Amino acid sequence: MSNIMEVKGKRVIVTGAAFGIGKAMTESFLESGAKVVIVDINEEALKQTAGDLNVEYITADVSSEAAIKNIISTSNSSMGGIDIFCSNAGVGGESGLLNTTEEDWLNIWGVNVMSHIYAAKHSLPQMLEQESGYFVNTASAAGLLTQIGAAGYSVTKAAAVSFAEWLAITYGKKGIGVSCLCPQGVRTSMVEDAPGIVSALVGIDGIMEPADVASDVINAIESDQFLIAPHEKVLDYIKMKAQDYDRWIEGMQSLQTQLLDSFPEAEDMFK
């Protein structure tokens, strides 16, 4: 079954929409003729974006299942249903293992993984009833290739990719489309505010503009494409990793050494 979905006229939720990729997605959906409700935890920035784009907004912490249920209920009331759920909210994390706390792990797991699970759990019943629906789950190239130094980010983004795969396998023949967004460096506050070593790493193949990533998302939905890899080199890296895992590990170890030689002040991030 093909789950190609024309975006025009569709009812869309975008989380993490106050800035960056989420805001750019919202703009692209609106330009394509969709109706959008935007969500973010940053109420001030969210209000500004909602006013600029003339859309409804919901302030929420997407790591909360109750909050996701309210987002869906409120959006159903205002839009008359949901066709596309873009689970885009995410948090970074530059620490390694030894300096992270239980609270750190629970926070990043809640936002980067559980928000996707809650969105699917509570959107699927109505999507299955209407025999159509689409999820765009934002992960990262780090979920496919691991990000040096960032234990929590790498682990949770890998889990996000795995959940998106499971969702596509389980519901793809039941009218539900799934795309998993896995960019490298994108010009967002998360990248621009990151330590120098992180910016150097994620920008190794160039920094993309959010609008270009958002355009890739629209194209993926309208062609029922699972993996969205805006940076084409990511696909080459995946092939290299699959062909010789040990060589790939050795290459990543060498890259880590090179980065630490250039940014010795960041050594604690790699423990």
Question: PLM features: residue spans?
Answer:
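Active-site-adjacent segment of SDR/Rossmann-fold oxidoreductases
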Residues: 32, 145, 166-176
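The beta1-alpha1 cofactor-binding region of Rossmann-like NAD(H)/NADP(H)-dependent oxidoreductases
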Residues: 44, 60-70, 102
